[in-house]
Amino acid sequence: MKKGFNTKCIHGSYLPKSGEPQVMPMVQSTTYRYYDNDEVAALFDLESSGSFYSRLGNPTVDNLEAHIALLEGGTGAICTSSGQAANLICMLNIAKTGDHIISSNSIYSGTFNLFSVTLKKMGIDVEFVDQDLEFEELK
């Protein structure tokens, strides 16, 4: 049975097994116990999935990311602690040392600082331009 949009908003992709909570519970743990070093090694080597430290992910965040991807029709999502963390992840995935980026000069001051200070330290040059310029004027 296909889920409607409202059902997806509430339940996402969470499918409880018999005897499990109807709604995905919030996991309030920072660390996870494993009885076998090989299990942990497989997690670190990305050979298996699971949680080992909440700063890197946990079942609650995994569920949120899957939920957002489902609602957006995407294949995955990344949730971050802040918009600035999201901005940095985006920039580091499209630019590398020696690259030149053009940005509007009419952006959030924190993003301006990220672009003009942090990215500069990483060897990524950002040029700020008037957002009302025509494409031909940028050349």
Where are these regions (language model features)?
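Well-ordered alpha/beta subsegment
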Residues: 73-74, 100, 136
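PLP-dependent aminotransferase-class I/II
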Residues: 113-139
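Hydrophobic alpha-helical segments in the ANL/AMP-binding
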Residues: 89-92, 110-118
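Conserved N-terminal alpha-helix of the aminotransferase class I/II PLP-enzyme fold
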Residues: 36-85, 113-117
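Alpha-helix C-terminal capping segments
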Residues: 70-71, 89-97
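Conserved PLP-anchoring active-site segment centered on the Schiff-base-forming lysine
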Residues: 93-111, 130
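N-terminal glycine-rich, Lys/His-bearing helix-loop that initiates the first secondary-structure elements
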Residues: 1-48
